[in-house]
């Protein structure tokens, strides 16, 4: 559960690429310790650029970013990576070593652990991510899902306070998505701050309580996911599609079933339909007595 502490604070940040392309405009946001936050928007909205500013890979043209109350302007990427871990959409670009075990060890270099401490962490992570049997395998021989799992394992081995995932469900099968969801739930128990960039609106509706919506390099909405992603104007502006639950709700209204528009979860929809059918059944029985 979140505590009222702005772990990430962005004040009026702008970023313009060397070619003159504007990627971020007047971004103001704060993310609390322990929060789970989604960032959504169409391609080119500035989502990936924004998360890269959090660990110093991109430095804002103007404005300031604070992590744990510290301005990160003078912090190196190596220093920031101890606090902020990012798993990018294409994890194969994050793999550098000859074996899986070496890859995870490589991620610990900036922590200056002794050999024993390092090996304990590596062994624990290999076990937790079900990668023990692959420790001597080359990362180049892994499937896309396994490579993404290795990238996540390498970041988790550093135990950063902030975890950022760029399109974690993209290209993943049902089993891999389930593994990721369980991973996130466990990290929430450890009061980790988690940011997820995603286009998966159904995933966001079910698992992400707060969503930041971006369009044209700006934040256009920030608040409870169930309110933002059911707002037709905002969804259309960002080229997203209304959640299936809302489309189903509309279909019910079209056939005369007045389902409350406030229903935004499958569980609540099922409860409503069961109640509706019971009431209708009771009325039919009463009319035939």
How should each PLM-predicted stretch be described?
Residues 55:
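Helix-to-loop junction immediately C-terminal to a conserved catalytic motif
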Residues 163-166:
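Catalytic Walker B motif of ABC-type/P-loop ATPase nucleotide-binding domains
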Residues 63-71, 80:
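Conserved ABC transporter NBD signature motif
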Residues 155-156:
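ABC ATPase C-loop
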Residues 116-134:
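Conserved ABC ATPase "signature" region
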Residues 216-217:
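Conserved ABC ATPase "signature" C-loop
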Residues 138-142, 146:
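Conserved ABC ATPase signature
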Residues 40-42:
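The feature captures the beta-strand-to-loop junction immediately N-terminal to the Walker
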